[in-house]
Amino acid sequence: MPKLYIKTYGCQMNERDSEQVARMFVQKGYTMTDREDEADVILFNSCSIREQAEQKALGKMGLLAKQQRHRPHVVYGMMGCMAQSKKEELFKELPRLDLVVGTQKYHRVFEHVDGILRARQERRMDELQT
């Protein structure tokens, strides 16, 4: 069973949104984990109003994404108002980031993650066939 790790930095609205996203994943068969090293999907939800929250999220995601070569199957994503306002910057600062979802698109997070995982699986199958 795939595992999801969500870390929320920022306001109460971010907490509520993270809970909703977690419910979506659980309904689709994921298990929640509080350990990043067990997760198949790592999502950070951060507020752009609180600069300290933003910096913590960026720093932590940067560290985790560097581990991607050791855990290439993991999907890394940023959500929230920071993701919405700094989408292009995030992809530049964190080149291993797979997903950036703003506040108006929370309902599509699972769909995006599922698409990323399917594309990776297809690519692996293509590599095995060549």
Where are these regions (language model features)?
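Proteins enriched for Cys/Gly/acidic motifs involved in redox and nucleic-acid/cofactor modification
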Residues: 1-130
